[in-house]
């Protein structure tokens, strides 16, 4: 296997390879609150490929909990239904080529799969400790004991496919709520998209997705702009309904009051994206901020909860119909996937899990929350680590528990929220991309299991911009493993599996929601490759008409220098050549002042470029220091001190070092941006270093300056800084020098 790139091998972007903030032990006996209060812990993950403890196999075990089988009324006399699930699965695969699909052709159901009344059979459910290959996360290179904080975060066995019910749940649905449920969900987006899609229209849209044929509509909405695409032939498919509040959304009765209380009316931006969210379209939202993050989280959690409840209640209703049907009545209800998990949240930190579960419990009243204390002790720490001097986006991401290797299953019943459920018995999976990859790749390579992702119907990536600063390959790995055909049956009742699952079209039915503070080429690639939903997709970006530069008030000259770069692939070479031939010679000509050295900070967004520049300076006459995400605390302190005192003329500083630490560097008189930072806040903060030096009188405003090297391949990054009204001229103009003050 090729080595993992990024921060320290597998970890990718850990917060400083040798400078992790805190240890796992800090979480033990942590804050114990009545609610999902914010808190924080972190640990340094081993950067080697640590082997995970494997649970022993066993032929005899008890079900995970007694409530799993309580609602499974069975009749063991029905020998036809007593066929092993593995036999059904094998026969189904052999006959798959004959199934009737939206594109034509026929499929003959396996002869032993009856269309008559189905009775669920008791299935043996091994506990997590009996699961072959169940990977448990290590702590400091050692396997956790069975009762630790991550013991159940494993992809354990399925329990009779999608067994959604606890004992007596169906009876708990009183007549009034049952009627309201039926009224609310009739002709709902859930019904049209998942439960009963029009087969002819589905076939047309799948064909257009294959041919990459989308009709497009531009939307000027909120404080941004959107592009709506639908794989349909008729322009009417681009029409959108108005969603001004939660009252305009088809919700389960038990969510209505809390939704109105928590969310109420939507603002302009929320009204722009709400139709896409609640109508199951894909959404790429490139305008996430600290201010709107909480509302976005609540909206998405409401949608996810509603989806789970609709799915479960549909299964309950069909179970009742099957139980009441007589043997001479043909009844087929396709209302399930291969496995139970339906929602996947890709989060950046454990504290983000705490915030997300806080949203869920605000929107749904649970009588009981199992393993809540254990969860808070492992995932939560007080959010008061940093002072207000740190930027708000930094504090939102890293305050509390900033550990970024985790995964946990969440099971929802009508009255209970159960944390630490095994993946195959979970409705929701909360995980970081790294944690999920570790779970899939652990153990014997021949027994790696990602089947628990086979029936994911909604995936949400909450902070794609933060994921970029870790290791984007982990996110790509997860998306590559979504909605694949399962390798094992997992006690699935294939007579209940929806046709589009069997036809391997689930990836085009799945809804994908990606939130980010800004968009980058990698995020756009994810959009083009994995967000191909038959319902359509919306890309929403901020309005960058004026750009960040018009809001800056430092009064410092900023010069943007365009260099020739004929190809995106050769751009790193062209940039390095330009830096060596144009930028370094100009730095060497700077006058030396009695107050210290020239104080030039070179900001390098890419670590690979940083290594290349640093190596090129080894044999030069420049006195320089360097700070990257891998530099240990002692060397960072020494580099900052020597640069501030003028002992070093240059300070090389990486974008990820700034992302993870937001150092306040003194002695900066001039800045060279080796490339345009993807995060526009970084430009403001680095420029602020020079502004503070001017305020302290260490350099005059005329002597201070900023130079930015850019090529035509950095259009997105440049637009966020200079604005869309200037970007065309700066990219295409004959001149290559552009000054701003």
Swiss-Prot record:
It comes from the Eukaryota. Residues 1-15 have a biased composition (Gly residues). It is found in: Nucleus, Nucleolus. GO terms for biological process: maturation of SSU-rRNA from tricistronic rRNA transcript (SSU-rRNA, 5.8S rRNA, LSU-rRNA). The keyword Nucleus applies. GO terms for molecular function: rRNA binding; U3 snoRNA binding. This is U3 small nucleolar RNA-associated protein 25. The lineage of its organism: Eukaryota, Fungi, Dikarya, Ascomycota, Pezizomycotina.
């Amino acid at each position: 296997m090729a080595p993992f790139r990024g921060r320290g091998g597998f970890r990718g972007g850990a917060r400083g390879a040798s400078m992790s903030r805190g240890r796992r032990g800090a979480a033990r006996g942590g804050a114990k609150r009545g609610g999902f209060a914010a808190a924080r812990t972190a640990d340094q993950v081993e950067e080697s490929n640590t082997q995970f403890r494997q649970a022993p196999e066993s032929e005899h075990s008890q079900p995970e909990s007694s409530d799993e089988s309580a609602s499974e009324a069975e009749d063991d006399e029905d020998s036809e239904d007593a066929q092993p699930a593995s036999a059904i699965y094998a026969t189904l695969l052999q006959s798959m080529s004959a199934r009737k699909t939206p594109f034509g052709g026929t499929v003959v159901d396996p002869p032993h799969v009856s269309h008559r009344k189905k009775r669920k059979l008791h299935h043996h459910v091994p506990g997590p400790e009996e699961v072959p290959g169940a990977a448990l996360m290590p702590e400091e290179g050692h396997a956790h004991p069975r009762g630790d904080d991550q013991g159940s975060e494993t992809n354990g066995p399925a329990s009779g496919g999608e067994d959604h019910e606890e004992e007596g749940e169906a009876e708990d649905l009183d007549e009034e709520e049952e009627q309201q449920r039926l009224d609310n969900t009739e002709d709902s987006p859930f019904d049209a998209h998942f439960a009963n899609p029009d087969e002819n229209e589905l076939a047309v849209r799948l064909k257009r997705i294959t041919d990459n044929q989308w009709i497009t509509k531009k939307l000027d909405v909120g404080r941004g702009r959107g592009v709506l695409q639908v794989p349909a032939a008729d322009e009417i498919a681009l029409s959108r309904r108005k969603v001004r509040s939660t009252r305009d959304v088809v919700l389960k009765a038990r969510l209505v009051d809390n939704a109105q209380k928590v969310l109420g009316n939507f603002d302009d931006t929320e009204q722009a994206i709400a139709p896409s969210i609640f109508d199951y379209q894909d959404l790429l939202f490139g305008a996430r901020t600290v201010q709107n993050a909480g509302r976005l989280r609540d909206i998405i959690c409401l949608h996810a909860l509603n989806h789970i409840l609709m799915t479960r209640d549909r299964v309950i209703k069909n179970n009742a119909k099957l139980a009441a049907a007589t043997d001479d009545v043909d009844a087929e209800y396709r209302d399930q996937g291969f496995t139970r998990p339906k929602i996947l949240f890709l989060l950046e930190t454990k504290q983000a899990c705490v915030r997300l579960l806080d949203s869920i419990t605000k929107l749904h009243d649970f009588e009981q929350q199992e393993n809540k204390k254990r969860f808070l002790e492992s995932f939560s720490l007080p959010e008061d680590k940093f002072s207000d001097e740190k930027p708000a986006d930094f504090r939102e991401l890293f305050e509390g528990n900033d550990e970024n290797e985790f995964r946990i299953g969440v099971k929802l019943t009508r009255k209970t929220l159960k944390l630490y459920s095994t993946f195959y018995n979970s409705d929701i999976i909360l995980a970081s991309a790294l944690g999920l990859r570790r779970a899939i790749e652990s153990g014997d390579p021949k027994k790696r299991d990602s089947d628990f992702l086979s029936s994911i119907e909604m995936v949400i990536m909450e902070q794609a911009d933060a994921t970029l600063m870790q290791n984007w390959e982990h996110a790509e790995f997860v998306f590559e493993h979504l909605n694949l055909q399962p390798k094992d049956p997992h006690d699935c009742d294939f007579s209940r599996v929806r046709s589009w699952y069997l036809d391997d079209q689930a990836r085009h039915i799945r809804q994908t929601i990606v939130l980010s503070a800004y968009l980058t080429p990698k995020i756009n690639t994810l959009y083009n490759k994995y967000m191909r939903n038959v319902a359509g997709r919306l890309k929403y970006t901020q309005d960058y008409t004026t750009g960040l530069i018009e809001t800056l008030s430092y009064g410092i000259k900023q010069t943007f220098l365009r260099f020739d770069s004929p190809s995106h692939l050769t751009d790193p070479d062209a940039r390095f050549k330009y830096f060596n031939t144009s930028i370094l010679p100009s730095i060497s000509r700077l006058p030396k002042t009695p107050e210290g050295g020239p104080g030039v900070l070179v900001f390098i967004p890419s670590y690979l470029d940083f290594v290349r520049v640093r190596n090129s300076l080894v044999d030069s006459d420049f006195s320089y220091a360097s700070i990257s995400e891998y530099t240990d605390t002692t060397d960072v302190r020494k580099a900052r001190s020597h640069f501030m005192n003028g002992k070093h003329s240059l300070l090389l500083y990486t974008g990820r070092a700034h992302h993870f630490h937001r150092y306040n560097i003194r002695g900066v008189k001039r800045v060279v941006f080796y490339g345009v930072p993807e995060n526009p806040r970084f430009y403001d903060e680095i420029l602020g270093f020079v502004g503070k030096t001017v305020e302290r009188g260490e350099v005059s405003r005329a002597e201070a300056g900023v130079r930015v090297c850019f090529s035509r391949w950095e259009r997105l990054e440049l637009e966020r800084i200079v604005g869309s009204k200037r970007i065309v001229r700066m990219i295409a103009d004959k001149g290559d020098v552009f000054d701003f003050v």
